[in-house]
């Protein structure tokens, strides 16, 4: 690098060919003008130009291009009031000046102010003093004695210009080498003759070599350069092309940490932007769209002034899967409501879902959307797990807009109550939770299986604390674009309220030191045992942490000593680790939360060792003398109502009291207690700490009206709050019934309570997400104050680390270079060619939306039954069973189900044989007659049907077969013949007697019924009717034996009236035994035995088996 490179400076303009290297004498116009005015007013000799001047203008001589364009050109009237005697001498520091630009008079700037920026960003030019050069001869300065003031001024001006030209030429020859050869001697003469404007224009035309500028002077991309005026571009046009090859293309300005620098203020888009749906080749959506409404999208103006960042983010959210990261209180709900309104207009029957982690957040979003978007209340519902599944199923069929928790949504989707194909928009609040297996991720995955055409809008204030966590959110929700704003962003700066953060650090009190000393003596023996076994390396018991002990246990179990140890040693080490991990939580309570929570934990630990409970090492600690002494000290302290067990708690009490007293809380003129509009929220990590804070603050009621605010799950010594109780506490807090809320992590996210003026963080969190969420509870509607109470040491370091981590993550997310977005899975949904335009108008809020209660479905005395589970199938799914071979093969080659079609025979030509081939030959004719036409013997031959009475014994049993088994018809035939042989000889006479008696009576008047063989009675018999007995016939008798025995042997026939018989049979008409007995003509005709088909089909007529009726017997006796 040449010497001239050392004198170069950095600039943020990418057009490096528009600058030349010259002396400060050309750029410091203030020095020349001061010299001219001094020679005109005071008649002094022009100062001699010296090359080794010291105390130069230095960095003050650098004039920013933007500031030079904004300041007006000076005239002679501005010379008045300037102290020309104190003008400093110039130096040889090099500066960059444009070659082609409209000339403006140089202005002397005393000092340039740098805008506030992070330390890793490059802030302005870097100056380096050139190496000393040997002195060169300078032209002697001419001294002129003016005759008059006007003539002397003109002469002095010419002499000064000539001296400047000579000095410039010598300086160019000295530092620029061959470059000065391009300037001939005549140019200096012409420069002295032309006026000042022409001289300066010529100086701008001096050629310039890019190699004279150091490589690191410009490191910015072309897109990061500030906008240039048209006049400047026109002047640079003819000269720009000759240096275009040396321009740094594709570069991006980066910070000292290797991150991409944030764009300059000039390149940040300001004002309202116009975005259009992306041009994608995708299948048409299955949602029914309203073509008339697609031409516009509505931006509500109900809230007053239009905010540019809300307008731009809303457009992006309509056309892309968007992650919106805005500081709390900047209108994320307004953006969500506007996007929901437009998708509600664009679709006819599709459903829109807003999900939030808790019911208080869900109810808060409902009230905001009702007042902003104007979506009808009749089409909106809020569903939680408390509603019955049957009621939720009815709501899913009738409504279009749903506000619910993600757990309820995934349950309804899995059970088939909700149809995933109808969902067109999913709005996710507190989207930083969408990592791992949280319900947000499961919902998006489930919907994607059935629906490829739905929009996702994710809202959060803190996307994540690490690059991996932010990428997990992007992957879990299929995010395609990110819109992030920080409190330093230009377009939101005017809407951010001031937040004054006060960090207070504390040291351990004397009581805490005493407790730590006694507790260390108690735990020291167990810690020493672990150290002797090389299972733990720490010596100080007060440095124990649950996480550190867990990691130490895992490392020891994986080491050679842990793997090779016997079971007794392993059990001992695990028992010691378990006891110390339980007591390590007590150490954290003592250090950061107070003595009272610490004492409660020890009492619970001691109660687990009563009697035979607890292990060896637990009893060892409880029986230790130091532990007993510690408990004796703590018991009277905690029973004292005035005791405050931590310095942070004492400071917290003073801060809260001072805040309310300054706000005029409770100072009424008439002696009544007035309620101010100010509110305070206190955040604590554990419930024990929250309850202790409430106990201390309640001493000052009614000035301080505190209440605890915890989650739903119950813990030891503390009951949880259901969602209904949480809502009531928030409402009372807004109304003023409570003016102080002491909340755990449940109050960190999403609660929109604009009147909170003071946030007190009782403990610090290493997570930047939780820290920013806590701070975001204040400063929403007016300026707020934040007080952080930290203990010196670990807690203070955690806060600093979380703050730095948050700032770095915001820079990474804004740069967009470290994350992979899913633009391919973000559907367009809208038809191609549709480009909605913005329509700003006042939204008419329906009267039904002004109701105060939430749109929850009403409970019913008898809720509807849960509908059967419905299986929603994705598009193009293969239903039915599939062969295993088709699962691994090509699915495209799978055989499709074809309808069986009957093939029609097609005529085929048959070769007609010759007549000689068809007719029998004489020999064949003789063989036919001999074998088949003539029978030997003299007896006549007859062709008869097969006889069933021939060979009865052989026909009644199956004969042996070899290759072919007997068929079903043969088996039935054999069974029929066996039954026929079982019929006795008196069968014919018995049937004749029965039919003769039956024909003597009219069939419609009476029916012959055997007394001993009546059918089984119905269940509904009258009381006192006994069940008739039934005789079991032997196996060898015929099927007609019971009838023969009952009728023939007893000879008792009882006619029964049909009405009485119907009552006994349950109004059932008797069924004839044979089908031939149905007609009246058959009864009156001569008796014929049943034919063969009737006997065979006897069993087939009984289509349904008889049911065995049970008799209900009753006793009327008084006994």
From Swiss-Prot:
* One function term, GO molecular function aspect: four-way junction DNA binding
Q: What start and end residues bound the annotated signal peptide? A: none
Q: Name one GO cellular component term.
A: nucleus
Query: Taxonomically, what lineage is the organism?
Result: Eukaryota, Fungi, Dikarya, Ascomycota, Pezizomycotina
Class of this enzyme:
hydrolase
Q: What domain of life does the UniProt record list for this protein's source?
A: Eukaryota
Please state every residue range assigned to the domain named Helicase ATP-binding.
Answer: 313-481
For this chain, the family text in UniProt reads: Belongs to the DEAD box helicase family. DEAH subfamily. FANCM sub-subfamily.
Provide ranges: composition bias, Polar residues.
186-200, 222-246
Catalytic reaction equation(s): ATP + H2O = ADP + phosphate + H(+)
* UniProt keywords, alphabetically: ATP-binding, DNA damage, DNA repair, DNA-binding, Helicase, Hydrolase, Nucleotide-binding, Nucleus
Positions with biased composition (Acidic residues): 208-219
Species for this entry: Aspergillus clavatus (strain ATCC 1007 / CBS 513.65 / DSM 816 / NCTC 3887 / NRRL 1 / QM 1276 / 107)
Protein name, as recorded: ATP-dependent DNA helicase mph1
> Coordinates of motif DEAH box in the sequence?
429-432
Q: Which GO terms describe its biological process?
A: double-strand break repair via synthesis-dependent strand annealing; interstrand cross-link repair
């Amino acid at each position: 690098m040449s010497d001239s490179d050392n004198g170069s400076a950095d600039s943020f303009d990418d057009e490096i060919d528009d600058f030349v290297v010259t002396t400060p004498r050309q750029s410091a116009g203030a020095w020349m003008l001061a010299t001219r005015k001094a020679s005109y007013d005071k008649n002094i000799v022009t100062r001699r130009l010296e090359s080794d001047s010291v105390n130069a203008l230095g960095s003050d001589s650098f004039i920013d291009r933007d500031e030079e364009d904004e300041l007006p050109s000076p005239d002679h009237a501005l010379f008045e009031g300037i102290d020309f005697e104190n003008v400093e001498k110039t130096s040889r520091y090099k500066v960059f000046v444009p070659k082609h630009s409209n000339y403006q008079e140089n202005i002397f700037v005393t000092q340039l102010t740098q805008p506030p920026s992070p330390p890793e960003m490059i802030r302005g030019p870097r100056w380096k003093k050139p190496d000393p050069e040997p002195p060169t001869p300078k032209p002697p300065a001419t001294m002129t004695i003016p005759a008059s003031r006007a003539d002397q001024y003109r002469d002095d001006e010419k002499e000064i210009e000539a001296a400047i030209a000579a000095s410039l030429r010598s300086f160019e020859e000295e530092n620029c080498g061959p470059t000065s050869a391009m300037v001939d001697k005549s140019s200096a003469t012409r420069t002295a003759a032309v006026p000042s404007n022409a001289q300066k224009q010529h100086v701008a035309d001096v050629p310039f070599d890019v190699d004279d500028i150091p490589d690191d002077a410009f490191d910015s991309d072309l897109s990061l350069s500030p906008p240039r005026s048209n006049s400047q571009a026109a002047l640079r046009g003819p000269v720009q092309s000759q240096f275009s090859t040396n321009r740094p293309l594709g570069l991006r300005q980066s910070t000292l940490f290797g991150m991409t620098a944030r764009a300059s203020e000039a390149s940040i888009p300001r004002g309202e932007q116009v975005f259009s749906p992306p041009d994608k080749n995708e299948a048409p959506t299955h949602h029914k769209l309203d073509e008339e409404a697609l031409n516009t999208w509505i931006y509500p103006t109900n809230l007053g002034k239009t905010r540019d960042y809300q307008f731009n983010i809303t457009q992006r959210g309509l056309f892309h899967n968007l992650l919106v990261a805005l500081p709390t209180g900047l209108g994320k709900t307004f953006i969500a409501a506007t996007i929901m309104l437009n998708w509600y207009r664009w679709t006819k029957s599709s459903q829109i879902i807003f999900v939030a982690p808790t019911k208080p957040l869900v109810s808060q979003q409902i009230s905001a959307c009702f007042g902003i978007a104007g979506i009808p209340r009749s089409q909106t519902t809020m569903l939680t797990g408390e509603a019955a599944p049957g009621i939720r199923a009815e709501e899913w069929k009738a409504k279009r807009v749903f506000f619910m928790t993600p757990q309820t949504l995934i349950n309804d989707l899995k059970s088939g109550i909700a149809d995933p194909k109808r969902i067109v928009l999913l709005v996710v609040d507190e989207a930083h939770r969408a990592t791992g297996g949280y319900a947000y991720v499961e919902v998006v995955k489930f919907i994607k299986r059935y629906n490829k055409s739905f929009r996702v809008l994710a809202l959060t204030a803190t996307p994540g604390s690490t690059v991996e966590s932010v990428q997990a959110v992007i992957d879990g929700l299929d995010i395609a674009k990110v819109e992030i704003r920080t409190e330093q962003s230009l377009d939101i700066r005017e809407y951010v309220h001031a937040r004054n953060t006060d960090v207070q650090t504390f040291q351990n009190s004397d009581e805490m030191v005493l407790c730590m000393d006694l507790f260390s003596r108690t735990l020291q023996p167990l810690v020493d045992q672990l150290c002797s076994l090389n299972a733990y390396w720490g010596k100080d018991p007060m440095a124990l942490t649950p996480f550190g002990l867990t990691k130490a246990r895992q490392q020891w179990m994986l080491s050679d000593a842990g793997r090779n140890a016997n079971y007794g040693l392993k059990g001992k080490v695990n028992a010691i680790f378990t006891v110390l991990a339980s007591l390590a939580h007590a150490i954290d309570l003592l250090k950061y939360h107070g003595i009272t929570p610490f004492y409660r934990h020890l009492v619970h630990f001691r109660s687990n060792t009563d009697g035979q409970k607890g292990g060896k090492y637990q009893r060892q600690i409880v029986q230790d003398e130091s532990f007993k002494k510690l408990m004796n000290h703590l018991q009277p302290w905690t029973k004292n109502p005035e005791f405050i067990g931590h310095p942070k708690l004492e400071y917290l009490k003073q801060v809260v009291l001072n805040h309310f007293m300054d706000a005029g809380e409770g100072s009424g003129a008439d002696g009544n207690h007035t309620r101010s509009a100010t509110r305070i929220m206190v955040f604590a990590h554990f419930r024990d700490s929250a309850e202790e804070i409430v106990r201390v603050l309640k001493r000052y009621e009614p000035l301080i009206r505190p209440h605890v605010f915890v989650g739903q799950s119950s813990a030891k010594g503390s009951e949880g709050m259901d969602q209904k109780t949480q809502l009531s506490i928030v409402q009372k807090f807004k109304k003023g019934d409570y003016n102080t809320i002491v909340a755990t992590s449940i109050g960190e996210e999403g609660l929109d309570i604009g009147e909170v003026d003071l946030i007190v963080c009782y403990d610090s969190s290493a997570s930047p997400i939780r820290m920013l969420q806590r701070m975001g509870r204040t400063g929403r509607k007016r300026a707020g104050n934040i007080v952080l109470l930290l203990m010196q040491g670990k807690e203070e370091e955690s806060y600093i680390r979380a703050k730095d981590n948050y700032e770095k993550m915001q820079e990474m997310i804004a740069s967009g270079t470290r994350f992979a977005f899913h633009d391919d899975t973000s559907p367009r949904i809208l038809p191609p060619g549709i480009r909605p335009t913005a329509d700003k108008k006042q939204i008419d809020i329906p009267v039904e939306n002004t109701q105060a209660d939430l749109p929850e479905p009403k409970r019913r005395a008898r809720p509807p039954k849960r509908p059967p589970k419905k299986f929603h199938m994705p598009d193009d799914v293969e239903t039915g069973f599939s062969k295993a071979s088709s699962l691994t093969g090509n699915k495209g080659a799978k055989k499709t189900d074809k309808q069986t079609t009957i093939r029609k025979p097609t005529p085929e030509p048959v070769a007609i044989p010759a007549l000689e081939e068809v007719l029998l030959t004489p020999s064949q004719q003789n063989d036919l007659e001999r074998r088949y036409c003539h029978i030997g013997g003299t007896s006549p031959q007859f062709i008869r049907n097969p006889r069933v009475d021939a060979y009865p014994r052989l026909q009644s049993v199956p004969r042996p077969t070899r290759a072919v088994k007997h068929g079903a018809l043969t088996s039935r035939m054999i069974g029929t013949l066996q039954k026929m042989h079982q019929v006795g000889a008196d069968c014919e006479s018995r049937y004749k007697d029965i039919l003769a008696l039956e024909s003597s009576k009219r069939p419609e008047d009476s029916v012959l019924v055997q007394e001993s063989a009546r059918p089984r009675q119905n269940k509904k018999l009258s009381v006192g009717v006994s069940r008739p007995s039934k005789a079991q016939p032997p196996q060898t008798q015929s099927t007609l034996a019971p009838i023969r025995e009952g009728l023939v042997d007893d000879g008792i026939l009882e006619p029964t009236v049909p009405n009485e018989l119907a009552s006994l049979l349950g109004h059932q008409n008797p069924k004839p035994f044979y089908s031939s007995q149905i007609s009246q003509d058959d009864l009156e005709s001569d008796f014929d035995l049943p034919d063969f088909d009737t006997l065979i089909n006897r069993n087939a007529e009984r289509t349904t088996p008889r049911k065995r009726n049970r008799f209900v017997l009753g006793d009327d006796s008084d006994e």
